[in-house]
Structure formats: structure tokens, C-alpha cells
Amino acid sequence: HLRTRRQRQMCIRDRGEPRLTAALNYVADAGEAESSAKGMFTAESKGNTTAQLGYGTKKWGAALGYRYGQCGAGFGTAYKAVKQSCGGGNVDSQNFALNGFWKPEETGFIPSVSLAYGWSDLEGSTVEEAQTWMVGLQWDKVANTPHSLAVGFGAPLYVESQDGTNPDAPELAWEASLKYKVSKNITLIPAIFYLPESNSSQGVSGKEQFGAVVQTVFKF
């Protein structure tokens, strides 16, 4: 019985100790192509090589990510100016991301904070640099209730510099949500969001958008 208690105490202490994690993966968008020039690990694989290193606890943490994208690999962005076709050149990209979060010891007026920043450097392209960033805040147990409030704002991946005149940076996009616990098994999550008018210098043009959504979660 004493040994079991000590093991439990050690386990509780270990949960608060910082942990180091690492991950590495490779995806080839053209991995199943019939041409022998494509496939995996070739110059025309449209490959993504991603590595990530993280360190932290349940209360705080940070992660550094790196991605090498070959010609034709997608960026996952709505801004057309960032998307570059292969053409006759060898376009590739070096991409870096830094993310972190922090939670207060006790819930209250001070929120938990999430931060993220990404930067891309393109070679063989008219676009030279692109970046993205976001800030997220969350208040748990608002006013001593089981509900939580979250707010986030930032900018999607956009062109920072290019050949010729650099485009204007997009305006802020934001969203807010309330996690409302109706009962032990039912939660309502109403949310609102705002997307600014698209910047024509970023390769797209469109009107601003304001919307709302309600999600219902059932647990059995």
C-alpha cells in the first residue's frame, strides 16, 4: 500500500514536469503519379517535409515548426497571390512557425493566452516572403460559472514582399465564442466572426463578411 502511494505521488509530480516532444513527417502530393519522374522523394513529388519540436507542461508550452515545400505543394491560404504554379522553374519554400500557450494557475480575470506566428521564404517565385499570425484569449469559468469565453484575432497567410511593389497587409480578422453548459451532457457554443474586405493587391477582391454560428454538443 505504501509503495502504491509513493508511485501515485511520483506520477502526480511527473505530470507537472516539462516534456519534450518531436515529430517528423513527409507527404508527397504526387506520390502515386504514373510518371517515373514523380512518385516519392523526387524533384516533382510536390512533397512536404515537416518537423516539429515542442516543450512544455499542461500549463504552458511552446513549439517550433519547420516545413520544406516543393514546387506545387499547397500553402492552405485564401490569398491567391501566395499560390505559385510550378511553370518552368523550380519553386520551393522554407517555412517556419512558432506557437505558444500559457494558462494561469487559477481561473478568473486573467485569461489563458495562445500565440502563433508563421513566416515563409520562397525561392524561384515572384513572391519572396509571406507571413501569418494570431492571438487567442480564453476565460474559463466566467463570473464563477461553468461557462467559458474565447476571443481570437489575426491575419491569414499573406504576401509580405514580392518582386516590384509590395502589397498592403490585410486587415484583422476576428472571432468570439461562448461555451455555455446547459447541463452536464449538453453544451451550446454560439460564435460570431468577422472577415475584412479582401485586399486586391493580395490577388483577391471581395466584400467584408460578418457571420454567426451555433454549435450544440451532446455527451452520452
What residues fall within each predicted segment?
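Single conserved hydrophobic/aromatic residue that forms the stacking wall/gate
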Residues: H1-D14
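Outer-membrane beta-barrel "beta-signal"
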Residues: E208-F220
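Repeated loop/turn-to-beta-strand initiation elements of outer-membrane beta-barrel proteins
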Residues: P18-L24, T49, K59-L64, C71-A73, ...
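Transmembrane beta-strands of outer-membrane beta-barrel pores
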Residues: R19, Y26-E32, T57-K59, Y66-G72, ...
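Membrane-embedded beta-strands of outer-membrane beta-barrel proteins
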Residues: A51-L53, L98-G100, V135-L137, A176, ...
